[in-house]
From Swiss-Prot:
Effect noted on mutating residue 38 to S: Abolishes sulfhydration and impairs interaction with RPS3
Protein name: Transcription factor p65
Originating organism: Mus musculus (Mouse)
UniProt keyword annotation of Cytoplasm present: yes
Motif (9aaTAD): 534-542
Glycyl lysine isopeptide (Lys-Gly) (interchain with G-Cter in SUMO3) crosslink, residue number(s): 37, 122-123
Residues the record lists as Phosphothreonine modifications: 176, 254, 433, 504
Recorded phenotype for the gene knockout or disruption: RELA haploinsufficient mice show cutaneous ulceration, epidermal skin loss and a predominance of neutrophils and macrophages in the dermis and hypodermis in response to TNF treatment.
Region (Transcriptional activation domain 1): 413-475
Segments crossing the lipid bilayer: none
Subunit structure: Component of the NF-kappa-B p65-p50 complex. Component of the NF-kappa-B p65-c-Rel complex. Homodimer; component of the NF-kappa-B p65-p65 complex. Component of the NF-kappa-B p65-p52 complex. May interact with ETHE1. Binds TLE5 and TLE1. Interacts with TP53BP2. Binds to and is phosphorylated by the activated form of either RPS6KA4 or RPS6KA5. Interacts with ING4 and this interaction may be indirect. Interacts with CARM1, USP48 and UNC5CL. Interacts with IRAK1BP1. Interacts with NFKBIA. Interacts with GSK3B. Interacts with NFKBIB. Interacts with NFKBIE. Interacts with NFKBIZ.
Amino acid sequence: MDDLFPLIFPSEPAQASGPYVEIIEQPKQRGMRFRYKCEGRSAGSIPGERSTDTTKTHPTIKINGYTGPGTVRISLVTKDPPHRPHPHELVGKDCRDGYYEADLCPDRSIHSFQNLGIQCVKKRDLEQAISQRIQTNNNPFHVPIEEQRGDYDLNAVRLCFQVTVRDPAGRPLLLTPVLSHPIFDNRAPNTAELKICRVNRNSGSCLGGDEIFLLCDKVQKEDIEVYFTGPGWEARGSFSQADVHRQVAIVFRTPPYADPSLQAPVRVSMQLRRPSDRELSEPMEFQYLPDTDDRHRIEEKRKRTYETFKSIMKKSPFNGPTEPRPPTRRIAVPTRNSTSVPKPAPQPYTFPASLSTINFDEFSPMLLPSGQISNQALALAPSSAPVLAQTMVPSSAMVPLAQPPAPAPVLTPGPPQSLSAPVPKSTQAGEGTLSEALLHLQFDADEDLGALLGNSTDPGVFTDLASVDNSEFQQLLNQGVSMSHSTAEPMLMEYPEAITRLVTGSQRPPDPAPTPLGTSGLPNGLSGDEDFSSIADMDFSALLSQISS
């Protein structure tokens, strides 16, 4: 009630007809923090009650009925009467011994004080501060010394303005002291400014019971309540002291609205209220909604989302005119579809069929006399060795082929095929080409093989096969086979060169030029000039046994 007395009963001047002091800008009661001396920083400036973030005001007084020289003293006194000198002190420009004193401008009647700060003292320095007030005669209301001992409210002070002017005779005239509204320290929860910082929701059912989380500045859990007010209605949120978390958060449930059968939303005010001094925070809007089955407010969220989507689409730069646009003109441009000839796929290196792929059943119609062939001749046709790809040149004794030969087959590396059983005709392309060619040949049993190979019997050119070392020749063949398996491509010229070197008995000559296709020779690597008595002397059974081994 003491805070309301200056508003209801304003202080009257001591002399109605004489000068008096009036406070036209009160100091701001809350929001300022009292600073300790040990903090080593300025205590700030006391703002005016109408001060904002953009417009700063300060405590201001007006001396009515007087213009001229004078002095003013501003000191701190207690909030409650008797107004004793307060142990806190004013600091700033023109401040000493805990109070402010300066001369007034004689040309003005309104005076503002911008550089006033409040510095608080510790409880252990309380007695020393009171003794200093008594020694400096800082006692505006002349409170006896015995009454100055006792408890002090260190979280609230008042400003006391004492103005001294000159009377017509030039003597000092002390005007009646004037007190300001209380100023509270913002550090103390019981006197700090109440402020709602944030809530998780600002609407609820008219039946109440909705849980709300509220964040605020420091409050005292035993001296705080959530206050709802509306037109002709007021209520309080329900919570316990345990629902106040660290003085900065409150979890409460909303009270039911006065009209439970609400049909339209109603807006009310929600505030923090301190019962001890009836201090209220700035109001925050809260909306009571009609009770429906939609407890989770799905329809409300859907409508809000729809409205947001509509507003976005209206502002969208891609939202063009609704008139149908003319069709886009299209120009026919001829295109040339060039059919690219596909490149031929790389073909693997081909080899003619070896003796292992010949179907010897085809030789049954042929009448060949029995004979023996030397072991050296049998070694000329190994089953696993590749054969030189060479075109056979028909001689005068050969009959032309009835049909062109098939393409040479691809040599597939692998183990030699067993010839213990009859070898069937191969179905692959190119297999059995040599056998088909031999099938269409007609031999005379009395015809000399040398005539077929070139009719050359010069001993200086050819050497008898009996002089060939079979073991050395077999070793060379084995080396050729291993080389053909280890390398990517078979060495086709390995066997003819080795045979020539062994037959002639000379060292390996330098690589000769490629042999022309017209050169006489056999596909198994024998030179066409080698002399056999007759092809009928060849024992094919011995040849087959040698191939199978």
